[in-house]
Swiss-Prot record:
Protein name: Bridging integrator 2
Compositional bias (Low complexity): 267-302, 358-368
Modified residues (Phosphoserine): S273, S357, S380, S392, S420, S422, S424, S430, S435, S439, S443
Coiled coil (UniProt feature): none
The BAR domain, residue ranges: 28-244
One Pfam family this sequence matches: Bin2_C
SUPFAM superfamilies (UniProt xref): BAR/IMD domain-like (SSF103657)
Originating organism: Mus musculus
Classification of source organism: Eukaryota, Metazoa, Chordata, Craniata, Vertebrata
Comp. bias regions, Acidic residues: 311-331
Entry's Gene Ontology cellular component terms: anchoring junction; cell cortex; cell projection; phagocytic cup; podosome
GO molecular function: phospholipid binding
Length: 489
């Protein structure tokens, strides 16, 4: 009996060694290109998906195990903190019995969460991962049967192509090939049917696991929130019982470090109710008092700015009258003979005139108020010539020119060009431009000086420069006044 068993075991071992040798030989021939390897693209794709699914499943299972371990650690830490709090809480303090119930419920809640997490999440993932090993073994077996099938096929082809035919060897080769083909095709077909089903089952597994985790978290956090509110109420009762006790951190005998008073915690109503309670804050100074007192100051400041602007313009006009003595008389008389700044037909301003007006505005803002008044300025020679020519044109034209000066144009019209020697005019957008009109310098001087026109013309002739510029200025003033009469007739 013992000899028979030993012989059978030896025969089985020899048979296995022969298979391993035959498979190794076939693989070497396939790598060298001596034989053709059978391939199935459909199975290879399914096998690739399986290996990817296996790697993802093992990674998720490992992370869930770490998550459960962390929950256990948190459970133990929370339990120790609760037990220590119960030990230090004196029995004569308010809420001693309530604290004992809170600590017990806290421990039970952690235990329930830990057990259900292990049962509904970790065990489900464990069952899902456990089937990978079986499928992996079947895929490896299918690979071995594929090598046997290729080896039997190549052996049959070699026997059939031999020069010397042997019917016994041919029959034996055909029988071995048929067996290897049946075994391989059956196993291959089973895997082709099972692998896609297993690959699609991963979706249902993930849904089940994470639905269970989310539900367990929801229940756990909701119940834990209730326990936290109960604990906060117990501590609030203790605070009311000993309201005269203040938590102070002393400086530990350090001269540079002061004692600190710990602020009270945040109210618990912020978590339970949508509107958080209003905590007492330090009174804030109302902003209405400074604004009420600042209104008169702003009004007075605005008035001072307007006064300084008017004084600056007057002083600018006196400075310009001094500069006119050296400027060109033709340009000064032409610009002075124009109507008011807001006249109906202003000429387009040239770039040079605009630059000059900007420079005059800058100089007027820089001048200090009160340096000179317009009504008291001494008229320049150009102004005297202008007054003489204006009086000789007739009373009717002077009345129409005065009426034109009194009219105000809409604020959208630009100001007329001004030469460097003419009087200053208020801009349309300035506060003074809407209420006051720009007038030639001759109007205040003509009203205050009662001398006749002939005497003033002689004085102007005596103080003016050469005769040629005076003739040109007289001609230009006459043309300008005639054009104004033609426009209003």
């Amino acid at each position: 009996m013992a000899e028979g068993k030993a012989g059978g075991a030896a025969g089985l071992f020899a048979k296995q060694m022969q298979k391993k040798f035959s498979r190794a030989q076939e693989k070497v021939l396939q790598k060298l290109g001596k034989t053709v390897e059978t391939k199935d693209e459909r199975f290879e794709q399914s096998a690739s998906n399986f290996y990817q699914q296996q790697a993802e499943g093992h990674k998720l299972y490992k992370d869930l195990k770490n998550f459960l371990s962390a929950v256990k650690v948190m459970h133990e830490s929370s339990k120790r903190v609760s037990e220590t709090l119960q030990e230090v809480y004196s029995s004569d303090w308010d809420g001693h019995e309530d604290l004992k119930a809170i600590v017990g419920n806290n421990d039970l809640l952690w235990e329930d969460y830990e057990e259900k997490l292990a049962d509904q999440a970790l065990r489900t993932m464990e069952n899902y991962v456990s089937q990978f090993s079986e499928i992996k073994e079947r895929i490896a077996k299918r690979g071995r049967k594929l090598v046997d099938y290729d080896s039997a096929r190549h052996h049959l082809e070699a026997v059939q192509n031999a020069k010397k035919k042997d019917d016994a060897k041919m029959a034996k080769a055909e029988e071995d090939f048929s067996k290897a083909q049946i075994v391989f095709e059956d196993l291959n077909q089973e895997l082709l049917e099972e692998l896609p089903i297993l690959y699609n089952s991963r979706i249902g597994c993930y849904v089940t696991v994470f639905q269970n985790i989310s539900n367990l978290r929801d229940v756990f956090y909701r119940e834990m929130s209730k326990l936290n509110h109960n604990l906060y109420e117990v501590m609030s009762k203790l605070e009311k019982q000993h309201s005269n006790k203040v938590f102070v951190v002393k400086g530990l005998s350090s001269s540079s470090r002061r004692s600190l008073v710990i602020s009270p915690p945040v109210q618990s109503c912020a978590a339970s109710s949508p509107v958080s309670p209003v905590s007492p804050v330090s009174p804030v100074t109302s902003p209405t008092s400074p604004s009420a007192t600042s209104e008169p100051e702003s009004v007075s400041a605005t008035g001072e700015e307007l006064t300084s602007e008017a004084g600056g313009e007057d002083s600018c006009e006196s400075q310009e009258s001094l500069k006119d003595e050296e400027a060109d008389e033709a340009q000064s008389e032409t610009s002075s003979s124009l109507p008011a700044c807001n006249g109906p037909t202003p000429a387009p301003a040239s770039p040079a005139a605009e630059v000059g007006s900007q420079e005059e505005a800058l100089s007027s803002s820089a001048q200090s108020p009160g340096r000179g008044q317009t009504g008291k300025d001494t008229p320049s020679p150009g102004d005297v010539v202008l007054r003489a020519r204006a009086s000789s044109e007739g009373a009717e034209q002077s009345k129409r020119a005065a009426s034109i000066q009194r009219t105000s144009a809409p604020p959208s019209r630009p100001p007329p060009p001004r030469a460097s020697g003419s009087g200053s005019c208020n801009a349309p957008g300035s506060p003074e431009g809407s209420s006051q009109l720009c007038s030639p310098r001759a109007s205040p001087d003509a009203s205050s000086n009662p001398e006749p026109a002939e005497t003033r013309e002689k004085e102007g002739a005596g103080s003016s420069g050469p005769e040629e510029p005076r003739a040109v200025s007289t001609k230009s003033a006459t043309q300008a006044s005639g054009g104004l009469v033609g426009l209003f007739l």
